[in-house]
Amino acid sequence: MLVVTLLLAWTGVASAQPVAAGAALDMSRFRLFCPNAITQNFPTSGPAETTWLICWGEVAGSDSVANPNGLVIGPVYFRKSPSAPFIRILWDMRVSDYFVPYHPGSPRYYDLSIYNFVLTGVTAQDCPASVGGALLTTHVCKEVHDRGLMWKDFSGVRRGEELVLWGAIDAANYRYIQRYVFRDDGTIEGWLGATGQNLPGDELATHVHNAIWRIDIDLDGVTNSASHLRHLENPANPAGTALDQAIALPVAQGFGWSARTHDALEITHPAFKNAQGHLAAYHLMPLVTGGGLTQHYEAFTHNDFWVTPYNPGQFAAKNLPMYVAGSPPVMARDLVIWYKGSLHHHPRDEDGAYDVSHSWTGTAHVMWTGFMLLPHDFFDCSPFYKPCP
């Protein structure tokens, strides 16, 4: 069944199959059915310390409810040392939909599930070699470059590196940048970048760009569990104490994010531990810009995180309330996690201006929002700070 599932992943149709925890990756089969796979060692110069193995593809179909168009990432494996096995992190990661409601109440656009927009072209001007860029196709750019400081202490410093895959959805007057980052330390980031011309004929209408990501996470296999992480602290408490909670989620559900409680999702596998005996995990954490995450009349926007059982027919963000109906179990199951990022766009003069004939000229600069998948106790210690015992 592994051969079949790898083929399906490469052609853009997600279909996860049971794989035992710690099962060795069959590299020949992986390469056969994912010939465009990227192997990226870090650091880029000198002996490898960590390695990513990333399958990716493009979908440009006519039914983004069942198989959303755009850049599709997965399956993805990570190796935390040259002697360690490749561990599967996720099976299929993509944007499920872009929902764009305007403040007057209309229009309310679903840019993938209704309009089926696809990736636009990119050139060497988008993806210059001077920033580590290389065109993978006419729609997808790869960049490998410095990511800034990894750490700095009293006696030393180290800079990090990252691999970036990105494309941009051509949504009529807008471009939605789909940017996925794979850092040397095992962290994954997903970003929405919104840029383009304001709504023709109503350029000054305030609106929100929402991206809803669907992440079929498979941490060391498909038997995963999720917990809701949150921070509790009463600023009126003179003792100054605080509490962090990890609330196991037994059934499919959604919950919101708060800047005060630092809400996040923890994903674990019951048999996957590091050498110190600690349960390894990935934390899904918001990367919020612009002050917050919006909610709208539509029920699927009322939560920022969702956890659902894996179902190959469930890709539509707007159907999330249906996917959690009946409270199907999600503990020790094949899981899909969802996250909604929001950009509140209040038009400004920098977006453009009207000329004497009232024609609009200008382009809104890129605004960003996204998420992070952060490894937690995945490593035994940091291999980037020597010595690592």
State the predicted function of each range.
Residues Q17-Q178, R183-T187, L199-P389:
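Extended effector regions of multi-domain proteins
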